[in-house]
C-alpha cells in the first residue's frame, strides 16, 4: 500500500504566480491538510519573495523551508534531471520521486512527462486556483482576475476562465 501524500513541494513558478496575482498568502489555505514545502534551492531562486515567504513560514504552520540535501539515489536523480531541466524543477521532481509527495509546478513542458512516467502527482497554478474556487476561498471573478494579473505581469498561463478550466488532479 502506498503511503498517503502529505506534502506539496512548491516550485518557484507557482510562488511567483501567486505573488504576481497578489495572493501568495492564500496558497497554503488551498490544501490545508497538506504540508507545503519550499526546498532551499527553490527559495534561492525567488529572492524577491524572501520577505513574503519568510513571514508565511514564520506565522503559518503548514508551510516550511526545507534544506535540499539529497543523498544516494536522490542525488543521482537530481544530477540526471539537472542536465535537462532547471535546478528548482529538478530538485522538486527528485524529492517527490523519492518521498512520494506532490509537485506544485506549472512548468508542464519540464515536469509533465517525468511526473507521469514516475507516477508523481503534480498540481499547477490553475489547479490551485480551481480548488480555491471550489472551496470558496476565491470567487470565480477573483480567480479570473488573478489569472489575468499573472498574465499581465508577464508570466505564462493559459488565457482561460476558471469556469472553463478542467482540473484533472484529485487531492
What is the predicted function of each stretch?
Residues 36-38, 102-105:
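Short, hydrophobic beta-strand segments that form beta-sheet elements in well-ordered domains
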Residues 14-15, 42-43, 92, 110-111:
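Alpha-helix capping/helix-boundary segments
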Residues 63-83:
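Acidic catalytic patch
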Residues 5-10, 18-20, 25-70, 126-130:
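PIN/NYN-family metal-dependent endoribonuclease catalytic core
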Residues 10, 105-106:
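Short beta-strand scaffold positions
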